[in-house]
């Protein structure tokens, strides 16, 4: 019997089989849990996430979500709720920064707008997703939210 037998949740941030989110999902599944996955919009991202998720379990369920869009986050959790009876955990493992400002010698020149966009995607989305996850978790007496820090 696994520690997570019967637990079902959403993992956000599986980009490939080297991402932290993928390794977390691997351990969840190894301990009896089930994972659904959210990925960045676009067919290329869907294929990449599907390839990684299929290494963990057959027929993974994927959802598309632009984490910078409150509407997309709402749709993500609405669609998840239609497909699953429960949400026991949310794994938030996403980050974003405009690569132009990650170049050597550019960091100190990062404009406020680019910095705030990085904070919105990398940090605020945890709050937005937690807000949408909470009512789904409450239906079964609560749940767990885990986020990667950067």
Language model features with spans:
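Catalytic Tyr-X3-Lys loop
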Residues: 88, 106-128, 142, 146
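Conserved Rossmann-fold cofactor-binding substructure of NAD(P)-dependent oxidoreductases
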Residues: 68-83
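Residues in the short beta-alpha loop(s) of Rossmann-like NAD(P)-binding domains
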Residues: 41-43
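SDR active-site strand-loop-helix element
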Residues: 12-14, 38, 93, 142-150
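Rossmann-fold scaffold of SDR-type NAD(P)-dependent oxidoreductases
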Residues: 64-65, 85-103, 122, 147
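Canonical Rossmann dinucleotide-binding motif of NAD(H)/NADP(H)-dependent dehydrogenases/reductases
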Residues: 2-38
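Amphipathic alpha-helical dimer-interface segment in Rossmann-like NAD(P)H-dependent oxidoreductases
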Residues: 78, 82, 95-96, 117-141
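Rossmann-fold cofactor-recognition segment
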Residues: 53-71
């Amino acid at each position: 019997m696994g520690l997570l037998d019967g637990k079902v949740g959403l993992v956000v941030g599986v980009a490939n089989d080297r991402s932290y989110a993928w390794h977390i999902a691997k351990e969840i599944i190894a301990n009896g849990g089930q994972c659904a996955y959210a990925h960045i919009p676009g067919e290329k991202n869907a294929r990449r996430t599907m390839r990684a998720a299929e290494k963990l379990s057959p027929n993974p369920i994927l959802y598309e979500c632009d984490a910078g869009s409150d509407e997309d986050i709402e749709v993500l959790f609405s669609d998840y709720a239609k497909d699953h009876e429960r949400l026991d955990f949310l794994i938030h493992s996403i980050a974003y920064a405009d690569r132009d400002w990650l170049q050597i010698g550019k960091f100190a020149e990062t404009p406020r707008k680019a910095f705030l966009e990085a904070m919105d995607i990398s940090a605020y989305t945890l709050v937005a997703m937690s807000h949408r996850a909470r009512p789904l978790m409450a239906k079964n007496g609560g749940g767990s939210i885990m986020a990667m820090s950067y």
